[in-house]
Amino acid sequence: MRRTTVITIVVALIAGLAGIALMPRVARLGAQTTGDADLAGAARAAVRDPSGHRGLAVALVENGRIRTAGLGDRDRTGQPVEPGTSFEIGSVTKALTGMLLADQAAAGVVRPDDPLGATWPAVTGPARNVTLAELASHRAGLPRLAPDGILGWARILWSNVSGGNPYAGQDTDAIRSAADRVTPDHDERGEVHYSNLGPSVLGHALAARAGVAYADLLRARLLQPLGMDATVIATHADDLPAGRAHGGRASGRPLDTWSGVGYAPAGVGPWSTAEDLGRLAAATLAGTAPGADATTARFREDGNSHIGYGWFTTRHGDHEVVWHNGATGGFRSYIGLERATGRAVVVLGNTDKGVEPIGLRLLGVPEKEAGEAAPVAPVWIGAGLAVAFTFLGGLSLLGTARRRELDRVTVVAAVVWAFAYLGLAHRMGDWSVVPVWLWPLGAGLSAAGATLALTRWSALPVVDARVPWRRLLSVASSLLAAVLAVAAVSD
């Protein structure tokens, strides 16, 4: 066996073994339990597949009694989830914003059929004519997000790749400006089309009418009366609750928190606990929560669901559940109420694996009706990214190493890209559905390709003499792209 071949095999084996230590670690629900032991046991039994979950906080309301429990880990260091651990609650906040509308209507401050412009005179565009009730029920014909041009969509795309906050920098003025610019879709107005912009406009409109910020109005009218002292809105990183859960993908990648002011009424920035949301659920079931009338089903969504002010009502077989869920970068949430049985449930999770089926099972909904957690994206996308990026760099590098005409700058670019691809695979691939041992194989393959290329190093020119400027420009662009790719997926 040639010396070069032996060296290549040895280096590949070493890289593969090192890759085992560095390979992705899929989140898995930990064994730790806090709070009510019986509820914790029931919740764990409701988790059909612990893979993809890291920690859960649960509240169950029965006959006015609230029980809470924590399962698993709140972060990657193994700290336990407790009933008082704070989680991002995402779009569950839309239900709270709907309750604010019902509360302010009951107080005579506004009427649900008031036009937006009468409540928030600063909005002067075509959307000023939509009603508060339409905003609360996703029937205003507004888009899902504020129109923000190419740069806005680029920011969202970058945040999805990098695991960042797609709503950073969006304040109240940005929402008002968006409401001014947007023209409601007349074909969609009156029908339920889910929107983050609509509830955000509603929340800030109610706050403007009251002469306070949205967070202050929510605290004064809903949170304080219910004793929800742990529920806060983080407008920036300094506001994050102490001892909070840390969110991430089911595949193990940590993700940034979402914070901000503009989309806070729709779920960007609010944090709560199973204890606090259990209080909300109990009071709403009892009809004593401010704005509890928001849960009344008023408008038809489809044959199986209706919507009130923020709250959905859906029939699951013999069970009619009033509910809302939430999803931010690395968190999932669910609150469900069943009036017929006087029961309610709250489930909070710190990965992007859905928790709705867990909540429905705890309410007694049959397995078939409870279903399974829907993936964030089609499974084939995450699996394809994992496999393709894992092996693409190594295979490309092997091809480069075998080229007859080669130069050093090309080798450098190929090596950098090979390991950039490994980083992309590690961070962007869905390793909850792809065997994680493939990643060390990819690392070994890339190391083998790099070794073969570097064995020719001394005999290679710095740059191909035929078109040096074109080669240098191409390699420089390639290296820049590789560096950006690595930056995007770094913690």
PLM feature spans:
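Alpha-helix boundary/capping residues
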Residues: 46, 123, 139-142, 182, ...
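Active-site-proximal loop and beta-strand segments within enzyme catalytic domains
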Residues: 54, 62, 74-196, 210, ...
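Non-transmembrane alpha-helical segments in soluble domains
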Residues: 102, 117, 133-137, 203, ...
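Catalytic-site signature segments of enzymes, centered on catalytic residues
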Residues: 85, 147-240, 253-256, 262-278
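Short, well-structured active-site flanking segments
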Residues: 84, 96, 103-121, 209-237, ...
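Secretory-pathway/luminal and periplasmic proteins that interact with or process carbohydrate-rich
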Residues: 67, 123-130, 140-148, 215, ...
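Stable alpha-helical elements in mature extracytoplasmic
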Residues: 35, 39-43, 67, 93, ...
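Catalytic loop of the DD-peptidase/beta-lactamase superfamily, centered on the K-T-G motif
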Residues: 2-69, 258-491
